[in-house]
């Protein structure tokens, strides 16, 4: 009996921990993007002088990305936990797929950026064409692919929210509007990707407050049964 009670209490604590992880993801990704934005010229064809001068700041930003990704996985976990037995296979597939693709995109961009920093810092010869190709590749991955995967994740999450009531309806409709902006983005608006971590932050704060006031019965029955 004691063992069952301990497992029950642990199950109630897990969503709260995941909600905090969503906040950590938002803070880490925002900080990483801010450091990169203030250290690297916006023009992907610009020279490497600023990159070399701010290599330590850029390295710090890149080291934040894996921890942001881990926190994002916990955030995905708490959303699924709140949906519980109401989970729909179709929307769950889009939900998981877009989340994993988004993480894959930012990790790939981070890996290429880390390689460029490593080569520039080691004194190895890197032609301007190779550097420009790396910069353009990173820019395209983040502003063409990752940003749209973030939009798809927001749409699937907002749709699930409307069907299950895991977050307020106004928050779901806000997610649709912001996702549309990400999907239609042509990459000319600097910092538009920051919309995604800020949206995750709002969802996580709501879940954290909701858990502190007592978990709702709707959509969460699978964790307590």
Feature map (PLM): residue ranges:
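Hydrophobic, aromatic-enriched alpha-helical segments typical of multi-pass transmembrane helices
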Residues: 1-225
């Amino acid at each position: 009996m004691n063992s069952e009670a301990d497992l029950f209490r642990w199950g109630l604590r897990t969503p709260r921990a995941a909600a905090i992880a969503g906040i950590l993801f938002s803070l880490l990704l925002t900080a990483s993007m801010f450091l990169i934005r203030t250290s690297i010229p916006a023009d992907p064809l610009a020279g490497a002088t600023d990159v070399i001068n701010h290599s330590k700041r850029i390295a710090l930003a890149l080291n934040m990305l894996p921890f942001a990704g881990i926190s994002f996985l916990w955030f995905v976990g708490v959303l699924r936990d709140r949906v519980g037995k109401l989970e729909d296979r179709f929307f769950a597939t889009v939900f998981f797929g877009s989340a994993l693709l988004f993480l894959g995109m930012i990790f790939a961009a981070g890996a290429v950026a880390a390689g460029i920093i490593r080569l520039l810092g080691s004194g190895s010869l890197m032609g301007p064409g190779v550097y420009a190709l790396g910069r353009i590749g990173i820019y395209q991955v983040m502003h063409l692919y990752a940003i749209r995967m973030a939009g798809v994740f927001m749409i699937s999450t907002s749709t699930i929210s409307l069907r299950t009531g895991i977050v307020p309806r106004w928050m779901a409709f806000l997610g649709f509007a912001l996702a549309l902006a990400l999907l239609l983005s042509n990459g000319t608006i600097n910092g538009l990707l920051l919309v995604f971590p800020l949206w995750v932050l709002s969802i996580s704060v709501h879940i954290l407050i909701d858990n502190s006031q007592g978990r709702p019965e709707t959509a969460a029955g699978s964790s307590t049964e």
